[in-house]
Amino acid sequence: MIRTLLYWGMMLWGWAAQAQYTITGRVVDSATQEPLSRASIFCQGTTLGTTTDLDGYFQLSLRNGGYDLTISYAGYQPQVLRVQESVNLPVALVKKDNALAEVVIKSSNEVADGWEKYGDFFQRHFIGESNMAKTCAIRNPAALRFLFYKKSNRLKVVADEPLQLVHPALGYEIRYQLDSFVYYYNTQYFLYRGYSFYTELAGEDSMQSVWKRNRRTAYDGSRLQFMHNYYDSTLEENGWVIDLLNENSDTKFSKIDPYDTTYYVVIDSTEEIEIDFPRKISVTYKKKTPAPEYLRSMKLPKGTPYQISYIDLKYSIVIRPNGYFYNQSDWVQQGYWVWKNVGDQLPTDYEPD
């Protein structure tokens, strides 16, 4: 009987891992109801996307999990919808106000030669400083606008159009819609918000092998792997340790069981898990040492054995089977993962062998 139950458990797990659902819909102009042909439909942070046909219809099959689906068309305001099951979506896009778009308001804080002054600084913090990240380049830097605020001593960067990045080390072209990047010089704290879409580069078999190896290197120890392992209940065997900041302490942490129901809940009806921590946690990855570039950047000793990141959750987060989690704005990180930026990130639909 036990063997039978185990067998069926494995069958159900396998079915869930392979399950798919389909998003269909039609994209039209909100005012005229005319179809919008070749509108872009894509899941943020993935390689999954399509376009509408001549009549505005689309269909997109997705692997089990949650996604933020973006629908966009030139000259129209984009829509973002969260999807996690089969659904038909009637989408009406609203035209941008061309009259307002033509009025360019020159901010007194804008830096005229911003790319020359801050381009390298921006790339180090937005793309990253690892050897992998250094191969990633922005093709359209003219889309960036740099604003410096003297009173608060902060730099803000915005983009007039999606950034076009090419990443030859990982084998992707990346379209990144940058909402904003802000760096606070007084505290050396920075954040950026936006969303990306990945397209795989074409290459010979030898190049595909290099990309496969590099992608696996980028995956090991990443936040994406952490989410996959947390969902699959395989944190410990994959080298992860979670410690919780002690009460009434600013520095001392104690190891916890991440699957204790104090912090972890399985939502059976939706195949989701919910996690929450009352205080800051440290996340240690014990299967890789920190990159030498990171140690130099942070002025840490060469013998530092593990990669450590620190997480504050504003509220609980929910993790879907594909590693997607929400709300992402409730996750604030420090430490190693902060050093790993766009140039070290993989699409969330990446699957290791």
Language model regions located:
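Bacterial Sec-dependent N-terminal signal peptides
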Residues: 1-26, 41
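Short, ordered, surface-exposed loop/turn motifs in non-cytosolic proteins
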Residues: 23, 30-45, 64
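A short, amphipathic beta-strand motif
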Residues: 23-29, 56-58, 91, 103
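Hydrophobic beta-strand segments
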Residues: 39-43, 69, 105
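A short, solvent-exposed loop/turn motif at the edges and junctions
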Residues: 43, 70-81
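Short, acidic Ser/Thr/Gly-rich low-complexity loop/linker segments typical of extracellular
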Residues: 46-57
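Structured interaction patches on ligand/partner-binding surfaces of diverse proteins
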Residues: 50, 77-89
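Surface-exposed, low-complexity/disordered segments
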Residues: 89, 93-353
